[in-house]
Design a protein with these regions (language model features):
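Internal acidic/polar
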Residues: 1-20, 24
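Short helix-coil-helix linker/hinge
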Residues: 21, 31-38
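A short pre-motif secondary-structure segment
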Residues: 41-45
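Flexible coil/turn residues that form the inter-helical turn or adjacent wing/linker of helix-turn-helix
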Residues: 48-49, 54
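DNA-recognition helix of helix-turn-helix
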Residues: 53, 59-84
Length: 88
């Protein structure tokens, strides 16, 4: 059985002029369920390691808006990931 372990296919996202590779296919699918803006914020925060203040400046939005959108996106990602786990 261990010889037939399926490997995830890395998926590339473009954000802030950079290519971000998400190695987990499940996470990538969950990210695709987010609005483009929320996905952008999550990728900038956790893959490009930008702070909320930096993201806010790039998007021309208040830091509080970025923080709210980030938290809402994380909650939505958690829900999507749980749905996928339940389907397995």
């Amino acid at each position: 059985d261990e010889y037939f372990i399926l490997q995830d296919k890395p998926i590339a996202f473009e954000v802030n002029g950079q290519t971000v590779i998400v190695d987990s296919e499940k996470l990538a699918k969950a990210l695709l369920c987010l609005s483009e803006r929320r996905r952008e914020i999550i990728l900038m925060r956790y893959y490009l390691q930008l702070r909320d203040r930096q993201i806010a400046a790039l998007l021309g939005k208040p830091r509080t808006t970025v923080n709210y959108q980030k938290n809402a996106a994380l909650k939505q990602l958690r829900t999507e990931m749980e749905k996928m786990n339940d389907e397995e």
